[in-house]
Amino acid sequence: MVANTGPLINTFGKLFDDENEIEQAKMQLIGAMDDNKGDIIKIASYPFLVINVAAIDNTAFPTKYLSNVIKDELWADCSTCQKREYCHIFHNQKLIKTNQGRVFDFLSKYYIWETEYGHRMTIRSMTEQLAYMMTGGVECEDIVPIDLHKMMFFNLFFGYVGTIQNAQAQNVLAVKLAYENHFDQKRLRADEDLIIKRSYDELFSPEVVAIIHNAEKTSMFLKGWAEELRRIYFFLNIVPDESWRRDTEDVFSKQYTTYLDVRGGASKPSKSQKMLIIDALRMMYLGTVISNSNTIPITLSKESGIAQSVQLVVGELSVNDIEVISKPDSALNMEKQNLVLRVQKKEEIKLSLPMIDYFEELRNGVISTNIDPQLSHGIESMKAQLLKVVYIDSDDLEMIVLNNNGYEKINIEIDDNVIRLN
């Protein structure tokens, strides 16, 4: 078990005397870590079984772990405890168990989201957060009567005590991360029924409705009450699956549910996902999604994602050569499917969730010049791979000039030191 791969690679290189052998052996070892196939390989006659644990999807762990934690046989003593009527820990266990379908669904979507956005949590981090979600960091002997809603798991998960953010909860890094997402501040299409009409009976079970009514007595007019209602809704709503799917888009992103469908193998990439990629490419290179042409000019441009008014064309990509497919992540992650852009049946480019969400914003005209470095790297890597596929080595120069009506192509000829524009 190696926590830091740098010393492993360097130490392995010291087994060899020849400089070329050292570099070759290092590259083979790095390649094996990237492939993560779980096969025994030989590097310079040394047998290796390389498993890159950090690349193994662990997002299924939280729900499996929590399903064991809430088993009734583990809580038998609590049912006879003198504090059982006001113990938030015991109430959290019962509430989670009664509503585990929706609770597990939200937890799964949340941890996948964090992983896809580069915040892969360790098993330790996840268990810390789930333990805090159950207990709030309070020992049994310290439990005293309190408004129960304040210490319910839907608040503790995000680091709140009722409507108030708990500064001490920020010491649990996974809780701090959940808080900093501010999911509970996002407007939902369910807000009208949840916050304005207060149609609790249509949104929650009678048990949860009772919790909300009791909480309203002291918290209804406090700042942060609407956010607490949303936190309750995330974990405990009983709305139809289609309505919850819609709300999931509001909480996370518009493309998230279709991305999850492909990631989990429930469906193949859709035509709408292909059109999203095509529209995003047009926005990146042409500054508009409107085009009468079946081709997309691939140009040299700066790394801002904003189309320049004048660009040098290095090739063209036919929309018929664009496919969006799904492929297994790796031999050790067979249940996880990656969304892949395939160009001309040969070049394959992995599409991450941040890239998909960025494409959605780009298509809608939302241009950001301050994007995450990891996302920026993914976009520029894709552009470089597209350039490799479509590049044509030619003496002819072609430019595109963007205007209010779209763009026009200009051919440049250089003959006897004279430049001609056609």
Task: Enumerate the language-model features and the residues they cover.
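Detector for Asparagine
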Residues: 4, 10, 20, 36, ...
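Extended alpha-helical coiled-coil/bundle linker/stalk regions that scaffold oligomerization
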Residues: 66-319
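An almost-null, non-specific background feature
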Residues: 6-11, 16-18, 38, 57-62, ...
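C-terminal domain/tail detector
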Residues: 230-422
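Aromatic-enriched hydrophobic runs in primary sequence
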Residues: 40, 45-48, 53-56, 192, ...
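Extended charged low-complexity segments that act as oligomerization/scaffolding linkers
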Residues: 1-102
